[in-house]
Amino acid sequence: MMSQTKLEISMKANSKSKISRRSLLKSGVAATTAAAAGTLGAPMIWAQSNIVLRQSGTGVSAFNEIAAKAKEDLGITMEMTALDSDSVAQKVATQPKSFDIADIEYWMCKKVWPIGNMQAMDTSKIKNYDKIVGIFKDGKLTPTSTIAQGTAPHTVSFVDGANGKNFSSEETGWMTMIPTIYNADTLGIRPDLINRPINTWAELLNPEFKGKASILDISSIGIMDMAMVCEAMGEIQYGDKGNMTREEIDKTIGIFTEAKKAGQFRAFWKTFDESVNLMASGEVVIQSMWSPAITAVKAQGKPCIYQPLKEGYRAWAAGFALPKTTKGKQADVVYEFINWYLSGWVGAYLN
């Protein structure tokens, strides 16, 4: 589980590929069953109001099927824009009028919240709030769980009031974002081309794979993969991978810079499709990877494994956030959409 392993909360960007990103996704609500939906009462229907919700996010959950179901159940027309992680953060920070709801990643909160374009979300309006798992409230999945390193979601989940600017360490009734999905990532491998067991992050820099390794080129995520590798190699013991010292940063970057100079990496990838193409072609046999990309490689008839590693996983989480420009009836529609999103159908679909 997320909070019981050595994890860094990060996130990923996906392209507009039609390949399903559902594999291994988990809903941010502990119980999102069809039965739960029945206890919420019928959702409001907005069809006669010609309501359009502009959703901007990374594409992890930007499915046409979800938009169609929202139209069927709520009468809302969803316009979904999928971007890479850095572009999403930039858009949220600089173009709040260009969207009504943001599907963003928890690591982004420290970047975008201080700018002041987002509004806190009232948890009393979230019908399934009591079912949101503890990872997003106090950092623990169970009472005995160990809180993860990195930007653990609960550290940026709450602010100190409706107009709060500071993150709160405890529940306040006002969330920066309402959690929707989370997962944990590891290395992807081509077992047919490696022909031996892989059980540690350290293998990414094994000279055996010189010219056939890859790592993702998204700085906020890539640095975490790099840290997992360096610690697995015994080169660095981090105090907190999500809050590295300058010395830790320099040493981490130094190790990977030397590996790059030595020709360890075939390429660096930034998008979902790039990672799929590198692995499916056989140009790369071991790399940072996302579970849906594994599925995409397999769909091309190539063996590909999402390899469990003894050091644990790098986790990520996402949710819906509200810009200050979304007000009145439009804000009411956003809350209605989120309640519908957490009521069962979407959770079942994404799983």
Model-predicted regions and their roles:
Residues 1-23, 30-38:
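N-terminal secretory signal peptides
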Residues 48-115, 276:
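Early extracytoplasmic/lumenal segment of secretory-pathway proteins
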Residues 61-64, 113-274:
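Extracytoplasmic ligand-binding site segments that recognize negatively charged/polar headgroups
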Residues 95-103, 117-119, 209-211, 281-286:
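Alpha-to-beta junction loops
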Residues 186-193, 229, 317-330, 349-351:
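A bilobed periplasmic-binding-protein/Venus flytrap-type ligand-binding module shared by bacterial periplasmic
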Residues 200, 328-341, 346-350:
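Short amphipathic alpha-helical coupling segments at ligand-binding clamshell hinges
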Residues 263-327:
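Extracytoplasmic/periplasmic substrate-binding proteins
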